[in-house]
Design a protein with these regions (language model features):
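N-terminal accessory beta-strand-rich subdomains and adjacent acidic, glycine-rich linkers
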Residues: 1-152
Length: 152
């Protein structure tokens, strides 16, 4: 993506080029959620109307007072094992104590010029820093201290 915008008030990221938009945000529980991927749309500060929040019977809720917020039905950017989302996780870590439960929450981001090389992984490349912009999103599990770094 050539353009990356972060809206601090809504904690929303909008990545876009001439044809497509990719929008994600920090959810109310600190996880990253995917809001939109498709035809380019105009940037705005608040895309929360695109997050589907409705009550569903027989599902797991994060908050007792909010039966419209369920990780089982929200598109997460990087879902993990054991957080009431029963779909396949993006990562499952076996910890020393035998637990596989992680909860990676947003801690920050960084936008830099260029495209870093990923050792041992297939990736596109950029000839110069002006050809690309990279977004790094940092997620941290508070119990283990492990930090995930997502690159876009």
């Amino acid at each position: 993506m050539r353009n990356i915008v972060f809206h601090d008030k809504t904690k929303t990221f909008h990545l876009y080029n001439e044809k497509i938009s990719y929008i994600m945000c920090v959810l109310e529980n600190g996880h990253m959620g995917q809001i939109y991927f498709g035809k380019k749309i105009h940037d705005k500060e608040d895309f929360s109307y695109l997050v589907e929040k409705i009550e569903r019977p027989m599902t797991s809720y994060i908050y007792e007072w909010d039966k419209s917020f369920s990780l089982e039905h929200i598109r997460q950017e990087y879902p993990v094992y054991g957080t009431t989302d029963y779909r396949h996780p993006a990562i499952e870590l076996l910890q020393k104590n035998g637990s596989r439960i992680s909860e990676f929450k947003y801690t920050g981001y960084e936008i830099t010029k260029g495209k870093p090389k990923l050792q041992g992984l297939p990736a596109i490349y950029a000839e110069s820093e002006e050809e690309a912009v990279t977004l790094r999103i940092y997620l941290r599990d508070s119990l283990t201290g492990i930090i995930l770094e997502l690159l876009y």
